Amino acid sequence: LEVGTGSGYQAAVLAAMGCRVTSVERIPELATTAQERLARLGYGDRVEVRVGDGSTGLPGEAPWPFILVAAAAPDVPAVLTDQLADGGRLVIPVGRRYEQVLVLVVREGAALRTSSHGGCVFVPLIGEGGWR
């Protein structure tokens, strides 16, 4: 699951690596443009773009083996960690609006193992699971 489709660049890279991607974008125009671009590039069969509040993931389709968030949250959203499969990984920038740390969360049964992987700056994650 990718949260924050944007231009579709990250989804295209993942598709080129052989991944099937479901991506959620909150801005309808970005979602439409990205889906068209991905189809034009030959990734339309590997990437599905949906419009919605990606900050809450897609709980109806969980569990996910991997959730990649392309926007920063103030904290790791439990609504996303709850959707991880056993052994699943969540990568998300966490912190203040203009200064974050890239965080990896791995589900190990009922436990979550969290590690930080350096500073970064992403746009804010807007929605119920992020900045409101």
Predicted regions and their residues:
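Conserved nucleotide-cofactor-binding alpha/beta core module
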Residues: L1-L112
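Core SAM-dependent methyltransferase catalytic element
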Residues: Y98-R132
